[in-house]
């Protein structure tokens, strides 16, 4: 049969690997911020030198095996492309290794991903704190659009907002505390009246279709 069928099958498994690798990366980033954590065993050790560490071992393993599976796709593509009238045996080693190992790797990453998802730990308090810190920066896009719709000069409004957001960000980095941007916007002669007409900055208004 055409080796294109081998490629099509492994390419589909490669798509699974891509999706689960993306999931593992996102989880590791969110865990570094403290929003999510993968499940941990009571006796699990993150580092022999640093007892406090809680490394995302499962997510790292998921990413590693997903990479392996993803890298099988171009090999099988080359195998299909270099066949001689479908009659040579120079594909025998790759077929025996790549096809079987790809299915084993796919099985492994699905099991690991399911294990992570079944025991995923969410820290709502950390999520709420980060939303409070970052939501004002997200909301200024809405403020800019409403200002333009009201007849304001886009470049002028953009520059005013840019300067205030940078000042607010710098203050948070150097002094800590809550995000001061809303108060800074309210005190601006042009942005303050626009802000007063805006709906409350409720997080739910900025999640798009995430709930779906």
What residue ranges belong to the model's regions?
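Internal glycine-rich alpha/beta core junctions
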Residues: 1-82
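Glycine-rich cofactor/substrate-binding loops
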Residues: 35, 50-212
């Amino acid at each position: 049969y055409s080796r294109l069928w081998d490629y099509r099958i492994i390419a589909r498994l490669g798509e699974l690997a891509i999706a689960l690798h993306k999931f593992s990366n996102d989880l590791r980033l969110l865990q570094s911020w403290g929003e999510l954590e993968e499940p941990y065993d009571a006796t699990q050790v993150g580092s022999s030198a640093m007892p406090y560490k809680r490394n995302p071992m499962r997510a790292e393993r998921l990413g590693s095996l997903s990479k392996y599976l993803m890298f099988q796709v171009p090999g099988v593509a080359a195998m299909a492309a270099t066949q001689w009238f479908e009659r040579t045996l120079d594909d025998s080693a790759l077929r025996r290794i790549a096809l079987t190992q790809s299915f084993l790797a796919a099985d492994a990453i699905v099991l690991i991903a399911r294990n992570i998802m079944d025991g995923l730990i969410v820290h709502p308090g950390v999520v709420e704190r980060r939303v409070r810190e970052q939501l004002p920066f997200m909301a200024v896009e809405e403020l800019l659009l409403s200002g333009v719709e009201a007849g304001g000069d886009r470049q002028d409004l953009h520059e005013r907002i840019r300067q205030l957001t940078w000042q607010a960000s710098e203050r948070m980095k150097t002094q800590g505390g809550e995000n001061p941007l809303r108060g800074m916007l309210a005190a601006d002669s042009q942005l303050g009246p626009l802000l007063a007409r805006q709906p409350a900055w409720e997080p739910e208004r900025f999640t798009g279709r995430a709930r779906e």
